[in-house]
A protein has these predicted regions:
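N-terminal beta1-alpha1 cap of cysteine-dependent amidohydrolase-like domains
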Residues: 1-183, 188-228, 234-269
């Protein structure tokens, strides 16, 4: 029936009257259309946290170490968007580093998750030339690698793996808290994967691989447990987020952003 819809609309109406919570969507200017479903998922998650969410686009191609503090000023959370190609990627690393070192809740999706892994390798593990094989075929530290089954397939977008894949979550992780269950299924396609040869080093330095595909041992979710909320997913949770069933990771991300922002505001007083 219409009951759930009515309840949602009422809740949304109330949320609309709250002080907007600013979330930075860091991405490439020409991908605005591709980010539509992310904007909607963030807005829905806001309603479920009884807050109005203002999604503020931050152009990664213009971000530098010098202007990042100004660009992310007043942001309660940072979402590192998906997207192909090298252009604008250095700006994503700048945003990730700033958010990580200032403990601003951060959510990286697909390429955004890969950027989270690369930034950590460069600035925490000390592999300054770490990269993805997609961006730099000759990188000595390919923390993101092309998938084994893809190596023989050269055409882009040919057979990126797509479909629902099982993923097992580590108990006690932020991802597990969000879903409230250990076994999840998510749909996605990608040609690049986290390089498991580096897994032990990442984990020792504080970034944990908390979502693993049991069949292929692929890392699907990474997070930094000691930060308030710093999570990256290989899959696209925005595609399965709906008005009546908002994706749990978006809801958890906004919840953490609200809590973190309010804490910071209190500290200022």
């Amino acid at each position: 029936g219409l009951g759930p819809w009515r309840a949602f609309l009422e809740r949304r109406h109330k949320a609309e009257n709250t002080e907007p919570l600013h979330i930075a969507l860091v991405g490439k200017y020409d991908l605005q259309d591709a980010y539509k479903s992310i904007r909607e998922a963030l807005s829905q998650a806001g309603t479920y946290n009884d807050r109005k969410v203002s999604v503020d686009f931050v152009n990664s191609e213009k971000l530098t170490e010098e202007n990042v503090a100004e660009a992310l000023k007043g942001m309660a959370g940072v979402l590192i968007g998906p997207g192909f190609g090298e252009r604008g990627i250095s700006g994503k690393f700048v945003a990730i580093k700033y958010a990580r070192t200032h403990d601003i809740p951060t959510f990286g999706i697909c390429l955004g998750m890969q950027c989270i892994a690369i930034e950590f390798a460069r600035n925490v593990l000390g592999y300054t030339d770490a990269d993805s094989r997609e961006m730099n075929e000759k990188t000595p530290h390919n923390v993101i690698d092309i998938m084994e089954e893809q190596k023989s397939i050269t055409n882009m977008g040919g057979t990126m793996r797509l479909g629902a894949y099982e993923c097992i979550l580590q108990k006690g992780s932020k991802a597990y808290e969000a879903y409230g269950t250990e076994h999840i299924q998510e749909r996605h396609r990608h040609r690049y994967e986290f390089n498991n040869q580096y897994k032990a080093e990442y984990e020792a330095a504080g970034m944990k691989c908390v979502g693993i595909n049991p069949e292929s041992d692929l890392v699907e979710i990474v997070e930094i447990p000691k930060l308030k909320w710093f999570v990256g997913t290989q899959f696209h949770p925005e595609y399965s987020s709906t008005v009546l069933n908002p994706h749990p990771l978006f809801v958890a991300f906004i919840k953490a952003s609200v809590e973190s922002f309010e804490e910071k505001e209190k500290a200022k007083k």
